[in-house]
Amino acid sequence: MLEFETNIDGLASIKVIGVGGGGNNAVNRMIENEVQGVEYIAVNTDAQALNLSKAEVKMQIGAKLTRGLGAGANPEVGKKAAEESKEQIEEALKGADMVFVTAGMGGGTGTGAAPVIAQIAKDLGALTVGVVTRPFTFEGRKRQLQAAGGISAMKEAVDTLIVIPNDRILEIVDKNTPMLEAFREADNVLRQGVQGISDLIATPGLINLDFADVKTIMSNKGSALMGIGIATGENRAAEAAKKAISSPLLEAAIDGAQGVLMNITGGTNLSLYEVQEAADIVASASDQDVNMIFGSVINENLKDEIVVTVIATGFIEQEKDVTKPQRPSLNQSIKTHNQSVPKREPKREEPQQQNTVSRHTSQPADDTLDIPTFLRNRNKRG
């Protein structure tokens, strides 16, 4: 029998801090989508832009330095503005168990201030996750270079950094999509990155995760990637899972990850079988020693849609810095259970959660191959 914790006081405090224009827009998208269980903070050097934020806490940083006129696309100004307002930022983030720092990289405030804010959050003891976008190529070389510097600084400051490559968003949207709509979609993907994680902890669902589970997957894990899959119809769970692990947003195959966090969100008709089916597809595509946790959330607004979000953490830097390997086709990346997968070095940490989908080197009996991995494990325990 499943047991549910009802200790309300034990809920993790999650704060989302949007930094600069892109971060503020992502926070607005989250509020519009009624993302539950998180506190929102909007931070900007531009007082006028800050007034457009829907966040309950709005914080103008670097008032003396910028006089509320913005950072002029200069990351150094953004950095100094955050340093000027350090005490104000500390006060806003105090008491948080988990802090998401979300920003668009390449401009002044997001690029310069976000790493400073992330470091403050981490110093306060919060699990700190950065969710940032890399600018579109058409935004110019200067923004690309500034973004690279900002991303590098963010990696040093956070536990896990999810980088969303805006150019890959163009592979998702239609070719005739107006430029404003493309930027809006980039903000929306930022929102999905945060919501995909926060919902698992803060929103009641079929399968919820402990904050400790998420912490294990995301503490001090460095680079991370995100894939999103959406599907409807008869085979919607399998389709959404396949789309998530072959998402253009994933710049590397998920079998290179040390940890995988998965969110399966559907309407009130989402079945437990569909959750099992989606989770098993993602588990099969992952390294056999991966530490994987998953959860499921009910969103009444989705009706027939299923959304699968996969956050893959702990990529080894050398693998990504070398000439980028081509993302494998779906058929290559989904490994069947009876294929042996070579173990990767360095050795992974042993999974610690109950929800972890553990991969065994011993092969299951043929007649159990159709049963999802974690169901087989549960049957063995039973």
Swiss-Prot record:
Alphabetized UniProt keyword annotations: Cell cycle, Cell division, Cytoplasm, GTP-binding, Nucleotide-binding, Septation
GO annotation terms (biological process): cell division; division septum assembly; FtsZ-dependent cytokinesis; protein polymerization
Means of activity regulation: During sporulation, is negatively regulated by MciZ, which binds to FtsZ and inhibits its polymerization and the formation of the Z ring.
Gene3D superfamilies: Tubulin/FtsZ, C-terminal domain, Tubulin/FtsZ, GTPase domain
Compartments where found: Cytoplasm
SMART domains with a match to the protein in the record: Tubulin, Tubulin_C
Keyword Cell division annotated: yes
GO cellular component terms given for this protein: cell division site; cell septum; cytoplasm
PROSITE patterns membership: FTSZ_1 (PS01134), FTSZ_2 (PS01135)
Presence of keyword Cell division: yes
Composition-biased stretches (Polar residues): 326-341, 352-365
SUPFAM superfamilies given in the database record: Tubulin C-terminal domain-like, Tubulin nucleotide-binding domain-like
Region annotation Disordered: where it falls in the sequence: 320-382
Biased composition (Basic and acidic residues): 342-351
Organism superkingdom: Bacteria
Sequence positions that bind GTP: 21-25, 108-110, 139, 143, 187
InterPro entries (UniProt xref): Cell_div_FtsZ, Cell_div_FtsZ_CS, FtsZ/CetZ, FtsZ_C, Tub_FtsZ_C, Tubulin/FtsZ-like_C, Tubulin/FtsZ_2-layer-sand-dom, Tubulin/FtsZ_GTPase_sf
Recorded GO MF terms: GTP binding; GTPase activity; identical protein binding
Chief site of localization: cytoplasm
Pfam families: FtsZ_C, Tubulin
Job description of the protein: Essential cell division protein that forms a contractile ring structure (Z ring) at the future cell division site. The regulation of the ring assembly controls the timing and the location of cell division. One of the functions of the FtsZ ring is to recruit other cell division proteins to the septum to produce a new cell wall between the dividing cells. Binds GTP and shows GTPase activity.
Family: Belongs to the FtsZ family.
Assembly and oligomerization: Homodimer. Polymerizes to form a dynamic ring structure in a strictly GTP-dependent manner. Interacts directly with several other division proteins. Interacts with FtsA. Interacts with Phi29 DNA replication protein 1. Interacts with the cell division inhibitor MciZ.
Protein name: Cell division protein FtsZ
Organism: Bacillus subtilis (strain 168)
